[in-house]
Curated annotation (Swiss-Prot):
A Pfam cross-reference name: GcvP2_C
Protein family according to the UniProt entry: Belongs to the GcvP family. C-terminal subunit subfamily.
Catalytically driven reaction(s): N(6)-[(R)-lipoyl]-L-lysyl-[glycine-cleavage complex H protein] + glycine + H(+) = N(6)-[(R)-S(8)-aminomethyldihydrolipoyl]-L-lysyl-[glycine-cleavage complex H protein] + CO2
Protein's recorded name: Probable glycine dehydrogenase (decarboxylating) subunit 2
Alphabetic keyword roster: Oxidoreductase, Pyridoxal phosphate
Subunit structure: The glycine cleavage system is composed of four proteins: P, T, L and H. In this organism, the P 'protein' is a heterodimer of two subunits.
Functional description taken from the UniProt entry: The glycine cleavage system catalyzes the degradation of glycine. The P protein binds the alpha-amino group of glycine through its pyridoxal phosphate cofactor; CO(2) is released and the remaining methylamine moiety is then transferred to the lipoamide cofactor of the H protein.
Gene Ontology biological process terms from the UniProt entry: glycine decarboxylation via glycine cleavage system
InterPro entries: GcvPB, GDC-P_C, GDC_P, PyrdxlP-dep_Trfase, PyrdxlP-dep_Trfase_major, PyrdxlP-dep_Trfase_small
GO molecular function: glycine binding; glycine dehydrogenase (decarboxylating) activity; pyridoxal phosphate binding
């Protein structure tokens, strides 16, 4: 039976003891001091007090982080079928390039002429993504998918602003099966969000969409395949409706892995698309980073020869044919501007560069196809099993992911989707995304990438079936899960409440000092 390590591990700051050191650098040789004189540090560079860093030995640091790793779980431990996250294997061949010491020592302010290799790699990723998505221009500037979304929304805003109709174009339409950050990005951009429902067939309800589209429509944001794992069959008709109304069509690339090499957003007539390098292109992610959300566009004319390409955030890497050099081009007059410091999350871009080179066009297409096969094999394993159902067009094949519902299980036993997730954890299996999308009650959003074996998928399905049977035999059992993990079931309210949530050591210090005021 699986058991996860349970170390009574303190924070590394709590391990600190005054005077303890990991290494003691030698004092400078007296002959050297005599030759060069004493070190004279400008007062403006001197600290007023020592840095607040833990004082620990090297062996304590190594043991501390080793023990923490034993209480964690990631794709190197086993499958992580988090729906809409595409947690695929991170090839070590890509890591060899991304962590090359010659790249780690570069500085973003170096002259372009001295970093031509890195700039070429960034430029090539832009070009490859442009072809993969079927678009005309691309930037790798955004640091995350959500930042790529915001860039797209700001471009839609600038588009209508330059055309002089922003005052009436105040609505962005978002299907209820879209990626979760779409409505947030639209709202951050200053737009009103109008939601359109999903029909029983898993497609956007076209009658509802026709009623929503009008003279106030600035654009539509959609994920295809949707968060249900279904390909939007009416995408060309949706595109026609939005464009005829004067709006722009935005593609959320969160689920690109399900169609890569088979279909392209540009061919679906999208105007703007973002891609997640940390999903489709194998860059490691989780815990907040590193992410990369490149944005690609069609050269749709805005006004007087200005196109959507001119609106892209930056800086961007371009190739100067006259000089035969790659250059960093700062944001131009019409650009929505900088979204972050420097060019991009360069490490993530270089990782994707190595992955795309290693896979090639055929390999990328095969990866998408295998992810689809894995998902549908899992569906077949779960088909008709008591406790779970497949909402929305159960006879339609899914793409990269599937959303099961534990509603029948809850109705009969009281066990919820959260209980199912805890039961998976208790068996050493990573839990899926739960309670999303919101249109599925007791949702279990499961995505097996191309990395997973037939045996891993079968083991996951078998455990889901065991959970249902255990809940039927004794409805109180699921509430006791997990028992074999490092941490037992947490109090979600306390863990997330503004009065108690403590995401960083800095917040912990402020709490101990009583400097965090009451919730207002």
């Amino acid at each position: 039976m699986w058991r996860q390590s349970r170390w009574n591990e303190p924070l590394i700051t709590e391990m600190s003891r005054r005077g303890r050191r990991g290494a003691l650098p030698p004092r400078p040789d007296e002959k050297v001091v005599k030759e060069v004189g004493p070190l004279k540090l400008p007062q403006s560079l001197a600290r007023g007090s020592p840095p607040s860093l833990p004082e620990v030995s090297e062996v304590e640091v190594v043991r501390h982080y080793t023990r923490l790793s034993q209480m964690a779980y990631g794709v190197d431990n086993g499958p992580v079928p988090l729906g809409s996250c595409t947690m695929k294997y991170n090839p070590r061949v890509a890591a060899r390039l991304a962590f090359d010491p010659r790249l780690e020592t570069l500085h973003p302010l170096q002259d372009d002429e001295t970093v031509q290799g890195v700039l070429e790699a960034i430029y090539m990723v832009q070009e490859w993504l442009r072809h993969i998505t079927g678009m005309d221009a691309c930037t790798v500037h955004p640091a995350a998918g959500s930042q790529g979304e915001l860039a797209g929304v700001l471009m839609i805003k600038r588009f209508h602003e330059m055309r002089g109709d922003l005052d009436k174009r105040r609505v962005i339409i978002v299907p209820d099966s879209a990626h979760g950050t779409n409505p947030a990005s639209a709202a951050m951009g200053g737009f009103q969000v109008v939601e359109v429902p999903t029909g029983d067939d898993g497609n956007v309800d076209m009658e509802a969409l026709k009623a929503a589209v009008g003279g106030d429509t600035a654009g539509l944001m959609i994920t295809n395949p949707s968060t249900l794992g279904l390909f939007e069959e009416n995408i060309l008709e949706i595109s026609r409706l939005v464009h005829e109304a004067g709006g722009l069509l935005y593609y959320d690339g969160a689920n690109l892995n399900g169609i890569i090499g088979r279909a392209r957003p540009g061919d679906m007539e999208f105007d703007i698309a973002h891609v997640n390098l940390h999903k489709t292109f194998s860059v490691p992610h989780g815990g907040g980073g590193p992410g990369s959300g490149p944005v690609c566009v069609k050269r749709v004319e805005v006004v007087d020869g200005v196109t959507l390409e001119d609106l892209l955030p930056g800086p961007r890497v371009v190739y100067s044919r006259e000089e035969g050099l790659y250059r960093v081009r700062p944001p131009g007059r019409w650009s929505v501007g900088r979204l972050r410091a420097w060019i991009a999350n360069t490490l993530a871009v270089l990782w994707a560069y190595a992955y795309i080179l290693a896979m090639g066009p055929q390999g990328l297409r095969l990866a998408g196809e295998v992810s689809v096969v894995n998902t549908n094999y899992f569906i077949r394993l779960m088909e008709g099993h008591w406790g779970y159902s497949l909402p929305y067009a159960p006879s339609r094949p899914r793409k990269h992911e599937v959303v099961l519902s534990a509603k029948p299980l809850k109705r009969e036993t009281g066990a919820t989707a959260e209980d199912v997730a805890k039961g998976l954890l208790d068996a050493g299996l990573y839990a899926p995304t739960i309670y999303f999308p919101l249109i599925v009650e007791e949702a279990l959003m499961i995505e097996f990438t191309e990395s997973e074996t037939k045996e891993n998928i079968e083991a996951y399905a078998a455990r889901l079936k065991e959970i249902a049977e255990e809940a039927r035999r004794d409805p109180s059992t699921p509430r006791k899960w997990p028992r074999n993990t490092t941490s037992a079931r947490v109090d979600n309210v306390r863990a997330n409440h503004p009065r108690t949530v403590t995401p960083t050591w800095r917040v912990e210090v402020l709490r101990r000092q009583g400097k965090l005021g009451p919730l207002r």
